[in-house]
Amino acid sequence: MAAPIFNTNTDALPVNPDLQKERASASFNVLELTHILDGGPEITKRRKELESLILSDPVFSNKDLLYLTKSEQYENAVLRSVKLVQWKNKYKWSPEDVAMAQRVNNSTEAITLHTDMFIPALQRLTSEEQREKWLPLALNHDIIGTYAQTELGHGTNLRNLETTATFDAATDEFVLNTPKITSMKWWPGALGKSSTHAIVLAQLVIAGNQHGLQAFIIQLRSLDDHSPLPGITVGDIGPKLGLNYVDNGFLILTNLRIPRENMLMGNASVSRDGQFKQLKSDKTNYSTMMYVRVLITKWAFGCLAGSAMIAMRYSAVRRQLYIDPKAEEVQILDYQTQQYKLFPALASAFAIFFTSQKLTSGYNQDLSSLIKGDKELLAEYHSVTSAMKAVCSDLMTDHIGTLRRSLGGHGYMMLSGLATVMLNSLTLVTVEGENTVLYQQTARHLLKQVARAMSGSVLTGSVAFLSKDLDNVPQLETPEDCRNVHLVLQLYQKMAKRVLIQAGTLVQTDLMQGLPEHEAWNKNQVTLVRAAKAYSLLQLVQCNVEGVDHLRTSASPGLVAALHRCCCLFALYYLNINAGLFMQTDSVSPSQLDTVRATEMQLLSEIRPDAVALADAIDLPDAGHKSVLGCYDGNVYERMYAAALGEPMNKSQVHPSYYKHLRGMIKGSTSKL
């Protein structure tokens, strides 16, 4: 290839002057916000130490990842996984260090499910004796595990999973089978080629009687040569939209025999003589799923925040067209339409952050009660984690798509980084429960709570608003009212309560008219999902308001003011999007909606001076985010050109296809001229 015509040494270039100007205009200390997002100054310091270690190692270079085949991507991910385990052992990393290292590496390892689901399942679903046996092996990576629940024919409907585990009293064993093509396990990450073991969800059968879904640990592959064991047929399911470095797999079980002790017996047990005993609520088996749904809210924040950072930096550097025809081309960040794409996305990221914080804190605080099988608490957490997983991943997906389009044509390039994030993060709307189904599960719980509230019960937790008298909440008459997030929050409560009551009334009316419950439910599905979404948005707004309020006594006034503006924008943006529900429930009037929209636009102009600083606080290192458009120095065009020169097709000036195909056509045509 010919020598570069333009400078490609971005390390020698100064920071783009437009970005320098943006950073100088910030009204708060960026590092202060970074500390909050990380969890404190010490955690930021630790993260940067891990970044320095990880991103300086050639194994974690992202330079040529786009050009790897699926098999090469997987091998690279395995290499990264092994390297992180080696460092964990060498440097005695804590679980928090491991989680942080995964985030630094954008979780581009092959066996994250080992840490995120296999180990938590061993911690939550086993007896003490089983934990002593299996947990050290998993923590030391002497075995590699996955969590095999979803089947080819059933994902959402767990009750109808078809894998069976039949107790053989003569041998004191369980015999596991996937009897039909739809019964095979399908989708678990790290199942195809990586894992040596799996926790399998199967229908327990004893003497012809079914005892529901139970968890079993099975060995998939030899610990000597990694070959599948007898009774195991396992493989990779093939290319996906994204995450092709993960070996999502299928698993067929044919008369696989395992010891009775391999049933995880923390919640239920089977004795030597075949007696089944339910020790805790059967819903406790789903505690691992709840945990992963909490994790998904964290991942949604990371994906959306990183995407917003990239789009914001690029929009500050990119100049195109004019606002004033007599002036120079303007930064596209100065266009109101661009701000309306970017600022609500960033505000949503902060709302998801505060929501995830509260959800994680509550889950950790209540974990012991959940493991003990507290039925009321399990029902509340199932509802809340379902709703928050769904709404956070929905918002993330919508905004990342908008952010990618905000980059114009360059956003279509994989080098933008956003295309990769968009494709990889799409899995979050279906993994651990398809969102529409999760909203329905939340709605079912909420209608029970509505009935309790209407009968006079005083509710607590996330449904406390159902017990409040919200009929006389003040209206949004002025721009100042619109900036009063506590007032706006009350209007969200009023809207959500009335929408839920309306949905419940529709179902109840159909039941009273003789419609069977399942038909009444199906007839009103869309309304019920809409009601659950209203509740979910309310929770996001409430967590956002509470999160900013909590900072008022500890953070600087400038930062609190900046986050307050984002909090206002988030609440008003989704009020505007859901204007129909707010008007339908008499929460706002059409004229008040005009005030809301005018305040939205004013907030865009107020956030504008802090936009880059708010995005910079996300603090993703250039070596980690895989984007030529979102680097800290803002040298977009030089990085794009340098990256294009690295395209393997450009290694030679004449592609082999010319000699194979084009030459004959061209020469044949020119001979006729």
Language model features with spans:
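Flavin-dependent oxidoreductase catalytic core characteristic
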Residues: M1-L673
